[in-house]
């Protein structure tokens, strides 16, 4: 039988338990028709890129399916009739990867606790250092002028 990966998005106001019940319903439908679920990942409640049926968030679920095309067609028809399911995307794959998907790997990467650090190296206040950074004293200006004059003298000596 061909292998498929299917991602479905359930509505925001559906609980995690109801999403798991939905997946069990899918598994029952597949088993009745000789198929099976080989992989199951709950990605959790995530923001949608755009509104879908007046929802801004949804519960994402990735399923690795082993079933016939007719069973898949019936599964997608049933999910289309279910009001709790916003979207379904199913792709045929050569093999189902047993490792966690990249979405779960990114979610659990080792960022750790940041404490109170909010990022950036700038001081807390916007005008703390004044406009244009710290002011240079007249002594600093003289030093820069002296360097410039030394560079000019070197260039002149090198040209001769």
From Swiss-Prot:
Residues 100-160 are annotated as: Disordered. It comes from the Bacteria. CDD domains: bS6. Belongs to the bacterial ribosomal protein bS6 family. Binds together with bS18 to 16S ribosomal RNA. Residues 106-116, 136-160 have a biased composition (Basic and acidic residues). This is Small ribosomal subunit protein bS6. Gene3D superfamilies: 3.30.70.60. One of its GO terms (biological process) is translation. Keywords: Ribonucleoprotein, Ribosomal protein, RNA-binding, rRNA-binding. GO terms for molecular function: small ribosomal subunit rRNA binding; structural constituent of ribosome. One of its GO terms (cellular component) is cytosolic small ribosomal subunit.
């Amino acid at each position: 039988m061909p292998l498929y990966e299917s991602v479905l998005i359930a509505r925001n106001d559906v609980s995690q338990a109801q999403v798991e019940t939905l997946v069990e319903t899918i598994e029952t439908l597949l088993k009745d028709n000789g198929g099976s679920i080989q992989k199951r990942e709950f990605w959790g409640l995530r923001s949608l890129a755009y509104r879908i049926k007046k929802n801004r968030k949804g519960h994402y679920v990735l399923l690795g399916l082993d079933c016939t095309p007719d069973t898949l067609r019936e599964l997608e028809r049933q999910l289309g009739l279910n009001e709790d399911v916003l979207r379904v995307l199913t792709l045929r794959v050569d093999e189902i990867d047993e490792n966690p998907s990249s979405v779960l790997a990114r979610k659990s990467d080792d960022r750790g606790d940041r404490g109170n650090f909010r990022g950036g190296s700038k001081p807390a206040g916007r005008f703390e250092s004044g406009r244009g950074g710290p002011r240079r004293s007249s002594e600093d200006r003289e030093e820069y002028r002296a360097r410039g004059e030394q560079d000019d003298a070197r260039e002149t000596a090198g040209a001769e």
